Amino acid sequence: MPYVDRQNRICGFLDIEEHENSGKFLRRYFILDTQANCLLWYMDNPQNLAMGAGAVGALQLTYISKVSIATPKQKPKTPFCFVINALSQRYFLQANDQKDMKDWVEALNQASKITVPKGGGLPMTTEVLKSLAAPPALEKKPQVAYKTEIIGGVVVHTPISQNGGDGQEGSEPGSHTILRRSQSYIPTSGCRASTGPPLIKSGYCVKQGNVRKSWKRRFFALDDFTICYFKCEQDREPLRTIFLKDVLKTHECLVKSGDLLMRDNLFEIITSSRTFYVQADSPEDMHSWIKEIGAAVQALKCHPRETSFSRSISLTRPGSSSLSSGPNSILCRGRPPLEEKKALCKAPSVASSWQPWTPVPQAGEKLLPPGDTSEDSLFTPRPGEGSAPGVLPSSRIRHRSEPQHPKEKPFMFNLDDENIRTSDV
């Protein structure tokens, strides 16, 4: 949305066609300066550009003959498009929405009206000649895209190619002013995978640094728990993450001093450890960020445990199913439900009451003689268990070092049995 800055100029982002009938639109920052009688467009907001960076295009308002909404025949696949007719050329521009387009058309038509001054015409002619000589000087200065890095405490500007090494765009003069792809151009589809919570709001803003207090354009992303900002939309790892639980207040920055004084659409995110100053592209965008961040913080304060509760449920459900698939289930297969319950109840007490390397025999007990066990097996069935009816084959076998448990009958043979041997007695 266009807005009026502190110098009473109409400003905002628009997409302009690089060459007429090419169908390729590039995002630029436009300034309608009625005092200088010209329409200027930059690679980005001049406050975010390097010192001395000029406009990449200019158009005198006196050359504009008509500004109108583009017909579907002219641009059938470009919504919210309007055209500026000037010097036998047509400049096609695309706005963000219908209201944005109407505001720009009305402002340009109002600014390009021809008015006859009441005073002499000679001073006005001199001013027009001076203003006409200014745009060629701006066009002579080459515009090169670059990235800014701090290496060893020194600011280093490195030229970069924006189209992947095919050479700099805009090196060939077209039908009108040379245009280059801007770093502020926002692609429609990002490469960063959304692995976390769904995003509530995302977009580019300008943020003040913490150490050098420099202003840099960053891609911000807001979800239910954090505010992250990235160097560009394609990055996967954020430069910093601000947790919403640490955010104390978010509001428009009204008390300004120093460098903040010249910043429009500025709001601040106050945390317990630091205050973040963020500049949006328009007042509507600023109020939208403030509203969404405040709503997310309030929702987190009202329902802080919903997420942790849902996670605990999801972790408990797989664990409960794993109990049935554990080692104990192998021992209990083929048993009736009652016997399975008994085995589950008795197994912990039996297994935990003895360790094979520390046998502690009770008083009055005698260990099984070594001759009664086979030399090839370390485990020996308890006396009477092998032939006793009702005992399952899957019962636990006693280790040779385990003390024998006391029995109700200390003597396991029946003395009245005729088949008993005298050697057994």
UniProtKB/Swiss-Prot annotation:
GO terms, molecular function: fibronectin binding; laminin binding; PDZ domain binding; phosphatidylinositol-3,4-bisphosphate binding; phospholipid binding
Annotated segments matching region Disordered: 312-332, 352-425
Pfam families listed in its UniProt record: PH
PROSITE patterns for the chain: PH_DOMAIN
GO biological process: positive regulation of cell-matrix adhesion
Matches recorded under Gene3D superfamilies: Pleckstrin-homology domain (PH domain)/Phosphotyrosine-binding domain (PTB)
Post-translational modification Phosphoserine, affected residues: S184, S314, S349
Residues joined by cross-link Glycyl lysine isopeptide (Lys-Gly) (interchain with G-Cter in SUMO2): K141
Location in or out of the cell: Cytoplasm; Cell membrane; Nucleus
Organs and tissues of expression: Highly expressed in heart, kidney, spleen and peripheral blood leukocytes. Detected at lower levels in brain, skeletal muscle, colon, thymus, liver, small intestine, placenta and lung.
Domain PH: 7-113, 198-298
GO cellular component term of the entry, any: plasma membrane
Residue ranges, compositional bias (Low complexity): 312-330
Keywords: Cell membrane, Cytoplasm, Isopeptide bond, Lipid-binding, Membrane, Nucleus, Phosphoprotein, Repeat, Ubl conjugation
Organism superkingdom: Eukaryota
Bias (Basic and acidic residues): 400-410
Membrane protein topology class: Peripheral membrane protein
Biological function: Binds specifically to phosphatidylinositol 3,4-diphosphate (PtdIns3,4P2), but not to other phosphoinositides. May recruit other proteins to the plasma membrane.
Name used for this protein in its record: Pleckstrin homology domain-containing family A member 2
Organism: Homo sapiens (Human)
Lineage, highest ranks first: Eukaryota, Metazoa, Chordata, Craniata, Vertebrata
